[in-house]
Amino acid sequence: MIAFADLEGQSALIGQLQHDFARGSYVHAYLLTGPGGTGKRSAAQLCTMAALCRGEHKPCGACGPCRRVLSGTHPDVHTVVPEKGKQIIGVGVMREMLDTVAVKSFEDGAKVILIPQAERMNAAAQNCLLKTLEEPPERTVFFLITDQPAALLPTIVSRCRVVRFHPLTEEACQKRLIALGQSPEMAKKKARIAEGCVGRALEIDDDQLDLRMELTHSVFSVHHPADALGVVNMYKEDKERQKLVLDTLEIALRDILVQQAGGASVADAGYAREALDYASRVPLSGGLTLMETLRRARVMLASNVAFASAFETVLLQISEEYAKWPW
């Protein structure tokens, strides 16, 4: 079982949460925000166990309620997710959950409502939840978990205690991964890709590491506009990898910008030679322009522009920078 002490890099806020729930002095709603993989869900689970625990040191992890929380079978813990086949949490799902809140707890203790992807609530669902947060039931605690707090109504945020989680430094993340059994070489690569988020680093598989090399080879080989189409065609049909493609490229660009600004070299970051050439050839201004182009590509995708069109704008910008700065 993970413990509060295992949530490294969050000592101050975790200490406060542990204190509140061990003493039963918690508030009715918490908003846990921060990048994915920083421990938000683990913290919510630990707080849930502490709120329901019957042991002396909360959470003990051994009593019946703690074990039921860990196994996902506690009758007073409810998780709100979209209906099967849907991406959005609608008002129907929210009303059904709130109906359970009105019923007496099964184990004569607290009731816990977990909303692990709170940004997926539509406006109607959020307004429905807001009414309950304005007049919260006794002995009920809500955990809204999200990496996109701006997607929530300000009135919902104002009725929650906001707890912000932060990534570790890459060095601290690397040490944690080594402690968890990763090789030093793999830990270094994963810590950089995950930007210090331990949970995210643990989810990185060989496919993502291979993509890092493959993508930086193909993308930074686009020296002329005519080269762009072939690279677009490599990824346009693979919808599962498209977000990963943009995320991986953004991390690579971030590292390149650091080198262009006089910081650490990208030579040992697991990128293809072509990315190293770009970092050495194009000045900081070009890297910043490319990062802005990538940001606009993400906006295009959010506006339902086809991935091929959005990705092509990035590739064409790369070829334009090469044209400006020939060898």
Q: How would you name each of these model-derived features?
A:
Residues M1-A124, A279:
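Clamp-loader machinery-focused feature within the broader ASCE/P-loop NTPase space
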Residues D99, K131, P154, S158:
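Conserved adenine-binding aromatic site and its adjacent loop/helix in ATP-hydrolyzing domains
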Residues A102, N127-L144:
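Conserved catalytic/switch belt of AAA+ P-loop NTPases
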Residues P116-N122, N127-E134, A150:
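Catalytic acidic motif of RecA-like/P-loop NTPases
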